[in-house]
Amino acid sequence: MLIRSISGVRGLTFSYLTPDIALQYAKALHKLLPAGVIIAGRDSRPSGEDIIQAIIIELTRLGRTVLHCGIVPTPTVQFMVYRTEAVGGLIVTASHNPVEWNGLKFVGKDSTFFSEEDCNRLFELVDAENDLSDANEKGIVWPERNAIQKHVIACAGLKCIDLNLSLIHI
């Protein structure tokens, strides 16, 4: 069974959350978000690579530019949406669930997770099974290898963080 909630979707990998199912959510995300860049990232679950590759292939087939952050913490994808002014993001993760599970979390232009209303609109698009034809022009994938570093540097520079590096001995 695929579980849908305000947290996104979750399911046993390759039983309920397959690359084919994931690309249906990618199609719906493409249709829901305005034109622009989508940030993608994943956790370190072994199944994440197949799922995110299916998503990226589908989004670029539909003409999207995808900034692919690779294996990153979920908040880093949110930060990159904010930092790059992307139109949204997608994270392949099942959070606290066992390794045989995986899931999809969705991020809006404001760099926060989708609201209940946004999730319901996305689920309706998936259920409608709209087959979107290829875009006139293929999208591209930009690998982002420094997303975590950019996120850490931005956090360390916040005025509310008292970072005393003199305490660190290497």
Where are these regions (language model features)?
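A generic secondary-structure signal
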Residues: 28-32, 80, 157-158, 170
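Conserved small/polar residues in nucleotide/adenosyl-binding loops
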Residues: 2, 168-170
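General structural feature for long, well-ordered alpha-helical segments within catalytic domains
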Residues: 5, 17-21, 25, 51, ...
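Ferredoxin-reductase
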Residues: 30, 36-109
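Gly/Ser/Thr-enriched, mixed-charge loops and adjacent short helices
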Residues: 12, 104-167
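N-terminal amphipathic/basic leader segments beginning at the initiator methionine
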Residues: 1-17
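Glycine-rich phosphate/diphosphate-binding loops that line cofactor/substrate pockets in enzymes
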Residues: 25-38, 160-164
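Glycine-centered structural positions embedded in regular secondary structure
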Residues: 11, 26-30, 58, 89, ...
